Amino acid sequence: LRNWNQIRPGVFDGGYAFDSYIPGGWDSGGTETSGLPAATYVVETAVPAGYKLVKEEDKNVDFGQEYEVMRTDPLLNVPVCVGDMHTVPNQLSLFPGVASRYAGEQRPLCDMKQVKLEDGRNAPADFFLFTEAPVAANVRGFITDDLDNEGNPQAPTFGEKYAPPWLPVSFHDYTGREIARVYSDEFGSYNAMLPPPFTNNIGSPSGVSPQMYEVCINSPYMTDPASGNLIKDPNFDPQYSNTCLVFQFMPGATTYLDTPIIPKAANAGRGQFPTDCEFPHHTPVIQKVDSADGGPYVAKPVGGGKEIMIYSAGTVEVPNPYYEGPGSSNPKTTFRDHGFGAAQGVVTLDGDKLKILEWSADMIRAEVASKHRTGQLMVERGDNGRQGLLGITVHVGASGSVHHVANGESIQDAIDNAAAGDLILVEPGDYRELLIVYKDVILQGYGRGAIINGIKSPKEILGQWRTKVDKLFAQGEFDLLPGQQNRPDVFGEYRLFANEEGPAVLVVNKENTPFQNARIDGFTISGADAGGGIFVNGYGENLTISNNRIINNQGNFSGAVRLGHPTLTNQNGYVDAMNDNVFISHNQIIQNGGLDGSGGGVSICTGADDYKIADNFICGNFSAGYGGGIGHRGLSDGGEIVRNWILFNKNFNQGSSVNGGGVSLLGAPPLPGDVLSPGTGSVTIGSNLIQGNLAGAGRGGGISLDQVNGQELGQNKYQVQLFNNLVVNNIAGASGGGVSIADAVDVRIINNTFYSNDSTGTSMESFVAGPLKSTPQISGLAYHRPQNQVLAAMGETPPQNPVTLDNPVLVNNIFHNNRSFYWDSATGPTGGLIPDIDGGEAPVFSDLGLVNYPQGSMLDPRYCYLTDATGYHASNIGGDPVVMDDYFNGARDWVIELGGNIVGQPAIDEGGNFIDVHFGPLTLTGNYHLAGSSGAINAGTNDYLSVFSFLKKDIDSQKRPNGNKSDIGADEYYAGANPDPGPTPDPAPQPDGGGGFPGGGGGGGGGCFINELVADRY
């Protein structure tokens, strides 16, 4: 009850006692005397406001078993009612029409009871009161983000976990019916009153049964009070999980709830300066493609061509990255032009230009001729030359039957009715179903308006999915992987896909039957939990996942797309999932989250040889494991990660060190009996923009390589190639703000730009000497000495003297302005980062370095541009390489200034990774293409062009070299060739970042110059 731990001058828990009296009564003026003499007394209760005295007609439950009135022993001296007489009415007071017992009789009220007190006996007299409405159960709750800290001194949780404000909280009964909906306040607190149970007289001290309700935090859907339809709650925050827990509630008691939630997205929770993961202003975005044959499909043209209609997304409302919070002069949302522009541009199908019949900002009519074939449709604006990453596949003819799914119909029914090779066309609409793709079919949406909604509401959706999965497996429609049968979930329950239940799209297949046609294309996929957006279990060879907007999904091991299993083993070791040759292309993968494993956005697990992740926009994803944006875990040889935008992703875990804010390559740990990891296989990471990613609890803000090599050593060496990447403005809590390398012994790093990356020295592995002061870490590129077991497998011994390493190969790279900080608890009231730039201290730059090597050991870059080339080979250049527009990381509000401190706020009473870094800008800014005055132009070497054909083009797919020698860095300078128009302002009065998409044209100017990094150690 609410009055525990209190002293009150009155009734406590309804109990009372008399141990004295005044002879002659209160008005006699007598003296109070201790002890009560044996006598007959009358005890009266005063009924408080809001309560009523229980009378014969006040029976409140008229169902259940009937009980006979117990005959009492006269020796018990049961007190009798002696109040005023009243007439019992004919009907029950709470149930009109139900006859009262003793109807019409005169009965005494029970507010006064006659008590016969005898020597040596107790004489209790209980009084029974009620309210017409049963006494409510009271709730007081608190929402916290367990992966973020509060740095606002005005907040009640300052120095503790961050409390997300204004989230919807829904209470459901066992049928799933919503009982109440409330909202948290600005500090994450909420309260509610809930109906109590009807069950009484059970075998418990109170006699009252608890009522069980499910509490759903950040509940996405509510009933529209006007229409009665289910609508999205306007306070639902898609950056956070929808977490449901069951609690018990008692009438009249207050239940205190601690209800944490987990972010789906990187940098979630802060209403101000939100992460900008929408396409830039004036970028063409396809909303829908249609034709007379239905959707992005035309029957094979014979003779003349066939028309298709391409509709743009038009003007789109998006979160404003310049919104400062309540009271901001900038609006919370802004509008961006995602139309096609008034000036005619270009439409290509599989690289061939289509004839334009009509062009407007909203719609294009184009002709598909008989020469054209099925392929990728892309639109390029005529006014600025921009081409978006998100296109759509247009099918010219079909090898099988064509199925059409209209809005309101079932996609799963179409899959069930299709045969291998069939094309399933899905119209725009909100399809709230969890799909199981178990056939070799093409699942084709009309565009991002066709939404596969993975939210499991109502609860029957998950039940139907379980039934469907069990039925398909029992019928032999798909096979499980070795060792997958009878695996329990985290609660010990055995069922199929226990740890990844209900992804929005589950892909399964039979063993030894590789897909020939399977494709998932042209959808928005959102709202999933546990299983994530798309989960490919196994035997998914040759699957294509393309042109989808995959947003706000969460999974136990990955948020958006996952291939295979990170930890599945059998007696032979890690299980090969047989997901080879999967192609993940032209998707917008934004603000998804994974709780474990690797890859908040995309997760590649053991057995995905020759996968390709190309031309995707991967932004704002979060992982509590490795790899905020992309995670490759286990052995998958021959993978490619190319031409992607990997922006503002994050990984963080308070309890352990996790690496790779943008991209992580991680070999699976050795199994019992093994000494070395199986490794990762060889992987190429090329022509990516890797910007603004954060490894808050470990190494490798942009890229981390861990346990790449292992069991293959002595016979072979897996090789990692880093070519043509712009790795800029990333942050690591430990070493390697740009890239961290550990147990990777054959790495080729050629023609990359590592610029303005930071190491904050705030992760727990940086606190070598204790929690008061950390050790500064290497920022640009950090190479860690391989484990002794790896060296032994290579036939080498640990280095004893200073060495100059020929691994990794470092050629034609820019390393500039990569800063190193460390934490000092003596700085400011709660500690801070050093150097103190605001206090006049100069930044410390740390471009390259070795970890755990003898003092004096060095890497051996050649033809590289370094902040300081002192001590390196003569082919290197020191100084400023001069790019179009660079900037330093800054505060979340990224005030433009020439210098500034990194500011941090700890979770004061916690250990592990107790410092959480917050920074900005979190919108596209800067342009790291070479300026015309750059000393990097024609300063490189051509030695590797004949070895690696990938290097014959730069990050913009322009020919290298442009002249006699290659330029240093990812960009090959072309004066005036295909210049990007630079940043285009939003309708709100702020700039929107510049630079073209990788593969879409050369350098251009624009952006802001920001020099302050704020590590809000919240």
Language model features: what each stretch is:
Residues 432-436, 448, 454-457, 502-503, ...:
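Short glycine/acidic-rich loop motifs that flank beta-strands on beta-rich extracellular proteins
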Residues 379-383, 891-997, 1006-1011:
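Surface beta-loop-beta hairpin patches that serve as ligand-binding interfaces in beta-rich domains
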Residues 1-31, 157-204, 356-357:
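Short, acidic Ser/Thr/Gly-rich low-complexity loop/linker segments typical of extracellular
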Residues 687, 717-933:
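Predominantly extracellular beta-rich ligand-binding scaffolds that present long acidic/polar faces
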Residues 269-343, 357, 384-413:
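Beta-strand/beta-sandwich contexts
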Residues 400-432, 934, 956, 961:
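Acidic Gly/Asp/Thr-rich repetitive segments characteristic of extracellular carbohydrate-active
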Residues 516-527, 541-554, 568-593, 608-622, ...:
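Right-handed parallel beta-helix
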Residues 353-357, 441-529, 554:
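Right-handed parallel beta-helix/beta-spiral solenoid domain characteristic of secreted/periplasmic
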